[in-house]
């Protein structure tokens, strides 16, 4: 899906995995590279890095979540490390079917400020 129109209306930064448990945000000037998962992402060599402290909102994908706003990710820990000590608004996005009553989480897992599904906001 082409979402390039968003860049015309908002200042948007996209996540790029840059190392083990390391993720950074970059503006998108149209120059991309294919990552190891086959996903196009902004080329860190050609795009401006954005400090997480300069972001107004961070949209976080959820594999699963609970009503306490704890999320289950893909297991790499990238978002947990990136969001640690960040005061930026953290919004998770998921489908209601991904809600888990018995989600197990650990001390290093980051609680989100909101989780939005197609039916509810937590």
Where are the regions a protein language model picked out?
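N-terminal active-site beta-alpha-beta segment that forms phosphate/nucleotide-binding
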Residues: 1-54
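Short Gly/Thr/Asp-enriched flexible loops that form oxyanion-binding sites at enzyme active sites
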Residues: 1-4, 69-80
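Residue-level signal for inorganic ion chemistry
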Residues: 12, 59, 75, 115
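Mid-sequence acidic-hydrophobic segments that form the walls
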Residues: 42-46, 61, 85
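Surface-exposed, charge/polar-rich loops and edge strands
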Residues: 53-58, 67-70, 80-122
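Short glycine-rich anion-binding loops that position phosphate/pyrophosphate groups of nucleotides
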Residues: 63-65
